[in-house]
């Protein structure tokens, strides 16, 4: 192209505009011919692709962190403090839905700051199951030992260990069938001796898992003086494996040791449908005391030490007086997780 000509149309001109265009081509928004760019090498293309993958992974991590922060639970703190640290913008419909779930503080008719809020905790069902087991087993063993000493019963505590042999099938009813046969043997012997009239078939047991995740049971059994049970596997009462029985020195400490081994991990791995513990033979007063200790601390304080506490919808009540204690805690299930919350004063 000769000098003094338009770079697009090739017509001679005196005035040039950006891109070497004449007045006519500039006014018509003429397309500027661009120089061809060199082809990008394979190494550079691979580098760009890796950078893109890294950026995408970083963004996914940021999104996951944002979700975790958004769903972070409030433990032991007021909702006002949580909202101040993690403000969330909600629509009016969203605010009503969150209010119904107890996840935000309740507003009063006054336009000033609210004086109430909620405390929310997450409940681990497996951990709660392990805690109930420890409380039931240790308290039941203590009450049995107190009854035996208070009533001046003659006898001794024996430890019975039950295991399954390799290849043997296990069933949730195996332990129940064993105690059914042992109780029948106990009652037959009791009916033939007058000195055993006041005796009861007392036992407390707790489950455990072996290294192969097979159930394994430890039983504390009260044997009156002169009564004989023998080995339950040789009598055919436990045909699933072997048994071992020996005299005990510290019945409460023995069961407390095995109850403390039962954790949330054990509860998760325990076969479905199998019971994990049991207690039998307590008198009426000891049963009432066991239920009292298994009730929440707030219910025990509200209803008193002599109450026969029973569970009712929305709280607990004393069966002796009919007094009802409404629980301040409400339970909500969100995406398979269990949350308990209550309204508190800020």
Swiss-Prot record:
Function: Isoform G2P plays an essential role in viral DNA replication. Binds the origin of replication and cleaves the dsDNA replicative form I (RFI) and becomes covalently bound to it via phosphotyrosine bond, generating the dsDNA replicative form II (RFII). In turn, viral DNA replication initiates at the 3'-OH of the cleavage site. After one round of rolling circle synthesis, protein G2P is linked to the newly synthesized ssDNA and joins the ends of the displaced strand to generate a circular single-stranded molecule ready to be packed into a virion.
Chemical reaction(s) catalysed: ATP + (deoxyribonucleotide)n-3'-hydroxyl + 5'-phospho-(deoxyribonucleotide)m = (deoxyribonucleotide)n+m + AMP + diphosphate
Native source species: Xanthomonas phage phiLf
EC number, UniProt record: 3.1.21.-, 6.5.1.1
An individual GO BP term: DNA replication
Family, as annotated: Belongs to the inovirus G2P protein family.
GO molecular function, one term: endonuclease activity
Keyword rRNA processing appears in the UniProt entry: no
Lineage, top ranks: Viruses, Monodnaviria, Loebvirae, Hofneiviricota, Faserviricetes
Full protein name: Replication-associated protein G2P
Keywords assigned: DNA replication, DNA-binding, Endonuclease, Hydrolase, Ligase, Nuclease
